[in-house]
Amino acid sequence: DVLLEKIVSQSDTQAGTKSIRELEKLRDDCLVAVMQGLKSVGFGAGEVLAKYENKLFSGATPAPTNIDQPIEVQRRFITADWADYNGHTNDSRYMQLSSEALDVFFRSIGFNSDYLATGRSFYSLESHVRYINESKVGDEIVVTAQVIALDEKKVHLHSVMSKTDGTVVATAEHIYLHVDTNLKKGSPIGEELLVRLAPIAKAHAKLAKPDGVGRFVGQSVK
């Protein structure tokens, strides 16, 4: 009885004024952080998670259907391991969020493990992130992708990261070069990708250029 009372007392002290739901959320956030940490070193449950994510990458991703507007490619909640010392989403996570979301876009046009196995891939040439508003743990972020330009070897993509109420928290633009991974040099984008990518680029060319496209670091804000 003494031991039980001590455990209850210590648990109450640790919980403080948090509700059961808040404690459950904290538990889940901690578990996610541990899983992501283990994934980075490929150990235990993290190894299982990494294999699962690789399997998702290898699987088929449906081709975009409504291409007459920026394409929603991903939604995710901001977890505790993404927060910085200010309590906001760490700036590096917006680059990660954009990069991972555009991976989904690439998979939707047929860029998967089978394509990689042919010795062809995309390499990043340039990226630029703009931080517009803050986001915090628990916020759901929606990422859309828009093709800004496309040529024989390069594709210029722009992503917008917004809260579900439409508040834009960040934007990013990236230029990717299609490469022959054996020769380590640029090469034409495969026809099996262009059959999906070219119509999207044509449709997006009719859209207004997103705010901030082409900006450089240090450029004055009007």
What are these regions (language model features)?
Residues 2-6:
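Extreme N-terminal basic, low-complexity initiation segments
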Residues 34-37, 44-125, 180-222:
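Hot-dog-fold acyl-thioester-processing enzymes
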